[in-house]
A protein has these predicted regions:
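Residues lining hydrophobic/aromatic ligand-binding pockets adjacent to catalytic sites
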Residues: 1-148
Length: 148
């Protein structure tokens, strides 16, 4: 049995999804400290003008763990992120098949960054028929050492 663990990232790479694909169990490492300007809240997209960083706006308080970081839903840059993705990829082959749902997930009033990232990751896994048992590290802390 293979178990993998990673922090929930914003718009994960194919390598991230491959890690889930190869695992029987996947743990979202959601109980570690948030790192500003990390893959947890941003990613690169490729535009006709070159790479572009897209960053989710968050309400950050010092020394917060990932699963406590709130998204700044009043910030208009969330819509700009969706528009940037649309502009960069609208002519790609499978865009119309996947973008509408991604847009809904991102634009929904998501309170916590980790929840948004996990929603995206689980949606991608479902879309690509990637199956694994998902767990949250924060839920496992109290269970360390327990046996079934």
């Amino acid at each position: 049995m293979i178990t993998s663990i990673m922090q929930p990232t914003f718009l994960p790479s194919p390598i991230y999804l491959s890690l889930i694909y190869q695992a029987d169990n996947f743990v979202f490492l959601d109980n570690v400290q948030f790192s500003k300007q990390s893959w947890q809240q941003r990613n690169l997209i490729i535009t006709k003008n070159g790479p572009l960083w897209i960053t989710l706006p968050v309400l950050r308080k010092k020394d917060k763990i990932i699963n406590k970081i709130e998204i700044d839903n009043k910030n208009k840059s969330i819509k700009k992120i969706v528009d940037s993705i649309k502009f960069a990829y609208s002519k790609k082959k499978y865009f119309s098949q996947y973008f509408p749902e991604l847009e809904k997930i991102i634009l929904k009033d998501n309170k916590l960054l980790s929840n948004l990232n996990i929603k995206i990751i689980k949606w991608l896994c479902k879309s690509f028929n990637i199956r694994s048992n998902f767990f949250y590290a924060a839920d496992l802390v109290d269970k360390i050492g327990e046996k079934d």
